[in-house]
From Swiss-Prot:
Protein name per Swiss-Prot or TrEMBL: Tyrosine--tRNA ligase
Gene: tyrS
Entries under Pfam families matching the protein: SYY_C-terminal, tRNA-synt_1b
Primary enzyme class: ligase
Primary subcellular site in the record, as a coarse category: cytoplasm
InterPro entries (UniProt xref): aa-tRNA-synth_I_CS (IPR001412), aa-tRNA-synth_Ic (IPR002305), Rossmann-like_a/b/a_fold (IPR014729), S4_RNA-bd (IPR002942), S4_RNA-bd_sf (IPR036986), SYY-like_C (IPR054608), Tyr-tRNA-ligase (IPR002307), Tyr-tRNA-ligase_bac-type (IPR024088)
Length: 419
């Protein structure tokens, strides 16, 4: 299957500048193509991942991906999709963000072989361009009326846009032109909001490299959920690729909770499963939705891809422990992941009566209630039911000498650490 046909089947193409021309190029030769990201933060979220998944699909089809981290454009900020001016970051913060993104993106691509990926930073070819060179060599190639008509600018005219953000599309166009000239890059990929920036780059290439220069642009549809809300957010906020911001367990849980109405679409967008495999999972969604086979596959594929096989096994282990209530097999690291959002208390390093301990921490409102819950078998320590009001909590009740997990009833968990 031609890579363009595959992307169309997956519903991953929104606009193309020259579908027939691009289809011919990718059929006849290996091409270089790029997608960029600005270091506006120290981590990508799963929304950022979408265009890079397309880039990876091209690599799997034998083409050479170029990953651009915008050390230069990041100093300005892309106005696309923004209702107000971005706050500028310090160069030091941008440099730190660049390195963080390099690490995350480095896990997604293969940097060896005939279709080896490369990673570039547009600061390297932009830093020495003087303001006079910028205006003379590039500014003169852009018609202000054309720039004003692009959605990325037009949408901001009423509230105002600075010259800095107005000029962003010129800098991005310079990137495409540079990669065309020095890396033989023929295609830029981006989200649907990048169409104006991409076409600006194509215009600059034709002016700088000649009217017969062959270059293409392709954008990806905005991904929304069946309920109309924005993809990539949970109740706790964005789902990050950085495991310190979103743990692998939380990452796994995000995908496992996908709505039946969305899961097949996500399998097409985010996994490398074949059409036959996805059709089989789609059938299971229709016939056996309660088994959630599609969601489990999606969660497993994504956790392995972004994190690792080991991280997936850890997420599955945590999920199983929480479902069964048997938490004794969990490590301290797994407990920190799985119980990140439960009420957490800090206890003294001392031997204390269970009833007194529950009340002193605030898990129980009174000794009377604590005794009643213990007597009735509603209190569990590390998964074991406690019905003895005389029990003493000591070091033997700690997992790896760091945590004690308390459960009240069937699902109410509390995490206790120690001073």
């Amino acid at each position: 299957m031609n890579i363009i046909d595959e992307l169309e089947w997956r519903g991953a193409i929104y606009q193309q500048t020259d579908e027939e021309g691009l289809r011919k190029w990718v059929e006849e030769k290996q091409i270089s193509l790029y997608c960029g990201i600005d270091p506006s933060g120290d981590s990508m979220h799963i929304g950022h991942l979408i265009p890079f998944m397309i880039l990876r699909r091209f690599q799997n089809a034998g083409h050479r991906p170029i990953i651009l981290v915008g050390g230069a454009t990041g100093t300005i900020g892309d106005p696309s999709g923004k209702k107000e001016e971005r706050k500028l970051q310090s160069m030091e913060q941008i440099s730190r963000n660049v390195e963080s993104l390099r690490v995350q993106l480095g896990k997604i691509f293969d940097f060896e072989g005939d279709s080896a990926a490369s990673m570039v930073n547009n600061y390297d070819w932009t830093k020495d361009v003087s303001i006079l060179d910028f205006l003379r060599d590039y500014g003169k190639e852009f018609n202000v009326n054309t720039m004003l008509s692009k959605d990325i600018v037009a949408s901001r005219l009423e509230v105002g846009i600075s010259f800095t953000e107005f000029a962003y599309q010129i800098l991005q166009a310079m990137d495409f032109n540079h990669l065309y000239e020095f890396n033989d890059c023929r295609l830029q990929i981006g989200g649907s909001d990048q169409w104006g920036n991409i076409t600006a780059g194509l215009d600059l290439i034709r002016k700088k490299q000649g009217e017969n220069a062959k270059a293409f642009g392709l954008t990806i549809p905005l991904l929304t959920k069946a309920d109309g809300t924005k993809f990539g957010k949970s109740e706790g906020g964005a789902i990050w690729l950085n495991p310190e911001k979103t743990t692998p367990y939380e990452f796994y849980q995000f995908w496992i909770n996908t709505d039946d109405r969305d899961v097949v679409k996500y399998l097409k967008y985010f996994t490398f499963l074949t059409e036959t495999e996805i059709d089989e999972l789609a059938k299971k969604v229709e016939e056996e939705p309660h088994l959630r086979a599609a969601q489990k596959t999606l969660a497993a594929e994504m956790t392995k891809f972004v994190h690792s096989e080991e991280a997936l096994e850890q997420a599955l282990k945590i999920s199983k422990a929480l479902f069964s209530g048997d938490v004794t097999a969990l490590t301290a690291d797994e407990i920190e992941q799985g119980f990140k959002d439960v009420p957490t208390f800090v206890a003294e390093d001392a031997e204390v009566n269970l009833v007194d301990w529950l009340v002193s921490l605030g898990i129980e409102p009174s000794k009377r209630q604590a005794r009643e819950d213990v007597t009735n078998g509603a209190i569990y320590i590390n998964g074991e039911r406690q019905q003895n009001v005389e029990k003493v909590i000591d070091a033997s009740d700690r997992i790896e000498n760091k945590f004690t997990i308390v459960r009240r009833g069937k699902k109410k968990y509390f995490l206790v650490s120690y001073k």
